[in-house]
Each structure stands twice: as C-alpha cells, then as structure tokens.
Amino acid sequence: VMSIWKFPLKKELGRKKRNVCHYPGACSYCHGDKIVAENVRFISRLNMNPLNGAKRILFYKCYMESTDDALTGTGVYLNCTLKFYGQKPFWRTDMGGAVFLNSDFYVCHDEDRQYFCKGVGPLTVVDCQFHVRKPVYAGWTHEPSDWLRCYQYGVTMNGQPYVIGADKPYNTVCMEQENVLHAYRLTDENGKVIYNTYNLLRGDDDWDPLQVKDSVRVIGEHDGRIMRICRSVCRSLRWLPLYRPEVIR
C-alpha cells in the first residue's frame, strides 16, 4: 500500500528550465496495487498520467489539470476537481473502467465538444458537475462502439440535469431507478450519502482505504437490501462492480 498525502511543494528541489519550450511529462508511474493520493495537486497537462500503472488507485480530494491522454484509467476519483484543457483527458479505461464520485469538471478550452476517452472504454460518473463557459456537448468517447455501456447518476451541467453521450443514448445507462447504483452510492437511515469505495476497491484482500465497510454493512442489514444483478446483465456488464452486503456479514 502506498499513500501520498498533501505532497509538499519544495521549490529548492526544482530544476532550472533548459529552455522556454513546454514538454509533456508524466507526473509519476508506478507498478503496484492499493495506491491512495489524498489532497494532492497534479498539474502536467499532456500525458500527465498520475500514478499510472496501479491496479487499484483512489484519488481523494485531489486537483488535476490536464489536456489529452492525461488521466489514470484505473482510478476511482472521489471529491476531486478536474480542469480539462483538452477534449479527451483519457487515452483508455478498458482495463477496468474509471469511476468519478462527487467531482467537478471544468471545461477550460474553447471547443464545443468534450469527451472523456480517446479510445472506447467503460466509465461511471456519479454526483458530478460540469462547469462550462458556453454550451458544450459532453460525451463518453469520440467514436463510441454500439456495445459500450457507461453509467451515470446525478450529473449536471451548470446546475441543470445532463445526460452524457446523448448522440448515442443507448451507450448511457442512467441509474436513477436502478439497483446497480448501490455499487457506487448508498444512503443511510439519516439521509447521509456513503460512496461505496469499499465495494469498488476491495478486490480479493478486503481493502477499505476510507474505512466505509462498516457503514456499508449497517445499511445492508438495516433495510435488508442484498443486491444481486441477474446473470444476463452481468454478462453484458462484465466490468461492473457489485454491491453484495451478504459477503461482508
């Protein structure tokens, strides 16, 4: 397990510029599992790829600026702020799919279309807000395949409800009336929202970086919900994380 928390900015460790040109550069690469970045600012624009290579990675309360091919496709992004200076911040997400929870997207370029991915891959966006300076179309990817299914809930653009990928609506699953939402988002008896990062990141070793397992279990026991997705749906949503309280009782 590796955690990066409030990574300090030490100017004395900086290097003098070789010239005035701007080069793309990765913030960091890693080969490992169970990575957490909390309250870290990642600024590198093109090809940033913060902590790219992690099997499971949580970005919590992080700030990112990016152009294209710049975000980590295996990440769970919770309470993050992302500024898009390019139209396609992801190169790919098909290794497992990226998830955004309660995050803000600021479209900072002048184009009239914003996508998440350059390639075709799964994404989930829950309780997220787009902030735009002019009308912008937001889509999952530039040329989505017919088989692609991405998931959204509670998405807004400048405060108004918004459906991502309206050009091909069959690519988008709106989870407002779906049990699958509990794989990402739960509400306790007091109305408090619990983002199910335990379910998304637990893997085979019960990893729970934000210590929400007990809350997830209590919610499952309180209202008797044991969410099972039928086999036919699971086959079509093979990357979908499942919320199953019975496995943690």
Where are these regions (language model features)?
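Beta-solenoid repeat scaffold
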Residues: 1, 239-241
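Sequence-level preference for short, compositionally simple segments enriched
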Residues: 1-224
